[in-house]
A protein has these predicted regions:
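Catalytic cores of secreted or luminal carbohydrate-active enzymes
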Residues: 1-77
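C-terminal beta-sandwich/jelly-roll accessory domains of carbohydrate-active enzymes
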Residues: 54-142
């Protein structure tokens, strides 16, 4: 539920809090966070963002909730990519195992990628435990 500090789905918030608590106990080998970006490389004009295998199992893109009927978001919402000029453009993304490939028209040499880096961002990247990735900015390794 976008733009609501008091979401209706309280059970999901409680489930996530319980996972964080369980992780504190010795011997509890559970995933308590969404996909965590670890590295960005560039190949063929596209950014390749690698995620920690511990958090990226079953990683997938999910359609974001529409912010309004006039401007529905798609499952590619929330991603921006910047070239060497430093100007961020809305981007497309696709999951390949524990990697997300990000690209946009007009960006041939990616420098940086931002995910969910807005006020009230679209959240579209989840792992197999349906835990969302936190917002991040990542720079390409050169």
């Amino acid at each position: 539920e976008w733009n609501d500090i008091h979401p209706l789905n309280k059970k999901e918030g409680a489930r996530r809090a319980a996972l964080c608590m369980k992780k504190l106990y010795p011997g509890m080998d559970i995933v308590n966070e969404g996909p965590v970006a670890t590295r960005m490389t560039v190949a063929d004009g596209k950014a390749r963002i690698e995620f920690s295998p511990a958090t990226a199992g079953g990683m997938h893109l999910r359609q974001a909730l529409p912010h309004s009927k006039a401007n529905p978001m798609t499952d590619m919402s929330g991603w921006c990519i910047a070239g060497q000029d430093g100007i961020y453009r809305h981007a497309r993304a696709k999951v390949e195992g524990t990697t997300v490939v990000v690209w946009a028209d007009g960006v041939n040499d990616p420098k940086s990628v931002r995910y969910a880096w807005d006020d009230d961002p679209a959240v579209t990247l989840y792992n197999g435990d349906n835990l969302p990735a936190a917002p991040f900015v990542i720079e390409a390794e050169r």
